[in-house]
């Protein structure tokens, strides 16, 4: 894992070099932004244990620096936010780190590249759909470093038609021994082709190499084919076939997943959007014990006068080998979630999120179910132009067939923050 730390430092240096070289080469609009946040955090069950709970209060201070640069054909973004965290339980301090860097450039009328790196050193689990990270809440508090790198190149060879080459790399490295560290490599290729104004298609392939410390290493091949038809400017229908093959380097049983679906993407009104996809997934194990699952996706978004409401429901098969928890593998699951964001007053914004998810794990010796309920609520008040005060509450209840995996956790956050532009040139 020491080599990965060197690569992270090298990646950050490359980004800074690209930023300053690009800024000097052409006329760019640059902004330096600074901020700071003060926080109090209460956690009722830091180790996500159903017995012998440990509670903790922490106090944190986190300065931040953001550097933005934009030009006619390229954009740079760099943000770094270290955090000094004091634990009232252990009377110790730690320093967290969060870094995000992006560089995209249009080299010609047809060629564009993207380079992005995200680094995080912390204890809390977190999810980020944009970079494809989901470290499960059930991990509890474990000190770790996580780095995610993405590089891609697109070539537009015709109207609404392109070829995309990509490479993604993720590294999870825990400070304590015995955790499921991993290195994940994923090169990929995607083709989007517009046949005519009504018909278009997408085909993609990705190979994933997973190198784990505690679990079996794996090789994964994943391919998808989509066919789209535009019924109208506001309505699109499509069909999809997907295939995934996983080969383990160890006693874990290899498997294939076949998925066939059809769907609808429609703007019901200027403020309402509906996405619907349904079909079936088939889980085929080399050692027998095949299973099938309903594949379903529903998303409804409604723009309110002063807010946004979203509702989603989904079911299918979920591959969780890279969740930072051992003995996860493939689960058959279903989930519902509702989110409401509302501007309550001129300077007061509220948020409420509720979700329920149920998993049946198919690769464990005895199939086990886990049921998770989550709620997340916050109020944010803006004042004095640059300042914001936020109070947030989260609750997680995990009810598992295996009693040792059951727990509930309450968290309360109080955050005072400010951010403003310091310099423009």
List the predicted regions and their residue ranges.
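Bacterial N-terminal signal peptides
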Residues: 11-22
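Gram-negative and organellar
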Residues: 27-425
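Bacterial N-terminal signal peptides that target proteins for export
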Residues: 2-12
């Amino acid at each position: 894992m020491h080599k990965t730390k060197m690569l992270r430092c090298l990646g950050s240096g490359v980004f800074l070099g690209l930023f300053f070289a690009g800024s000097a080469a052409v006329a760019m609009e640059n902004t330096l932004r600074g901020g700071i946040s003060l926080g109090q955090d209460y956690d009722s069950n830091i180790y996500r244990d159903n017995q012998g709970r440990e509670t903790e209060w922490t106090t944190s201070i986190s300065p931040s620096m953001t550097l933005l640069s934009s030009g006619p054909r390229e954009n740079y973004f760099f943000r770094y936010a270290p955090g000094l965290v004091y634990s009232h339980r252990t009377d110790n301090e730690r320093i967290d780190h969060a870094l995000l860097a992006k560089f995209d450039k249009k080299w010609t009328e047809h060629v564009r590249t993207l380079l992005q790196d995200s680094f995080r050193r912390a204890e809390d689990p977190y999810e980020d759909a944009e970079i494809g990270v989901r470290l499960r809440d059930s991990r509890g508090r474990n000190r770790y470093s996580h780095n995610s790198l993405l590089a891609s190149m697109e070539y537009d060879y015709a109207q609404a038609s392109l070829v995309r080459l990509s490479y993604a790399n993720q590294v999870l490295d825990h400070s304590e021994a015995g955790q499921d560290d991993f290195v994940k490599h994923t090169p990929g290729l995607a083709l989007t082709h517009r046949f005519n104004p009504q018909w278009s298609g997408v085909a993609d392939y990705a190979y994933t190499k997973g190198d784990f410390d505690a679990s079996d290493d794996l090789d994964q091949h994943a391919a998808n084919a989509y066919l789209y038809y535009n019924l109208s400017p506001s309505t699109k229908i499509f069909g999809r076939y997907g295939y995934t093959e996983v080969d383990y380097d160890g006693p874990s049983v290899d498997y294939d997943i076949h998925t066939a679906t059809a769907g609808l993407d429609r703007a019901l009104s200027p403020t309402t959007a509906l996405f619907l996809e349904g079909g079936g997934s088939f889980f085929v194990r080399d050692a027998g014990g095949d299973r099938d699952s309903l594949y379903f996706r529903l998303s409804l978004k409604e723009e309110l006068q002063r807010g946004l409401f979203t509702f989603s429901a989904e079911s299918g098969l979920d591959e969780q080998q890279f969740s930072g928890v051992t003995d996860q593998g493939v689960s058959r699951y279903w989930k519902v979630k509702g989110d409401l964001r509302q501007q309550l007053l001129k300077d007061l914004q509220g948020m409420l999120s509720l979700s329920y998810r149920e998993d049946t794990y198919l690769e464990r010796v005895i199939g086990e179910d886990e049921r998770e309920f989550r709620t997340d609520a916050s109020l944010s008040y803006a004042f004095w132009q640059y300042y914001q005060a936020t109070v947030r509450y989260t609750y997680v209840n995990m009810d598992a067939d295996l009693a040792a995996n059951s727990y509930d956790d309450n968290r309360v956050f109080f955050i005072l923050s400010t951010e403003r532009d310091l310099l423009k040139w």
